[in-house]
């Protein structure tokens, strides 16, 4: 089965990284190229420097918590969340140039000050972030890597689940959306075998219906038109055992 994402959503990749393949995208327009050259560096941060004790300090004052969206595509969901939650800081991770250019245009037009961007490997970002520093991680319609020999490239792996558990604070959230049944089953299996996460669904509608206030992405609308139904999986970070909290420096 081919990768179902649109070619223009799976656009030109930034330098090499662990969980993303290279794809050639459309040539950037002049203003988009200017945004990549001028605005992106102002919104990015250097993983070569030590992480701040609190990620809220990456933003202007007034930020109460920080969320991460991994692979934001065209940025529809991330922009809507940033507009709806002005006191929340959002870190958007996206390796493809065209997706980055799209969200930069929206940030500029809407004068949003609560979004920071990272064009590198999400695994490196998770390793850099301090423990218990994120309120939520969103993974919306990720690349399913459908061929068996490519499953190791899927973002959801035991290692990434452990990395998210480390950076999410107690009762923090992980939200996963996909219309690819195999990847949904894969994700559910990985999260259910982790002691650090609890699946919140109590009835079928809890995973069959979008989250409250959820903004559908362009790819999500396309999938619906073509008759593919997405699953909306919601997990919470379980309370850490006392010895785990001690290792994290909380005791």
From Swiss-Prot:
Q: Where does substrate bind?
A: 147, 179
Matching Pfam families, A to Z? Methyltransf_4 (PF02390)
Pathway of action: tRNA modification; N(7)-methylguanine-tRNA biosynthesis
Sorted alphabetically, which keywords does the UniProt record give? Methyltransferase, S-adenosyl-L-methionine, Transferase, tRNA processing
Q: Which residues form a coiled coil?
A: none
State what this protein does.
Answer: Catalyzes the formation of N(7)-methylguanine at position 46 (m7G46) in tRNA.
Annotated family: Belongs to the class I-like SAM-binding methyltransferase superfamily. TrmB family.
Q: What is this protein called?
A: tRNA (guanine-N(7)-)-methyltransferase
Please give the organism. Rhodopseudomonas palustris (strain BisB18)
Query: According to the entry, what is the taxonomic lineage of the organism?
Result: Bacteria, Pseudomonadati, Pseudomonadota, Alphaproteobacteria, Hyphomicrobiales
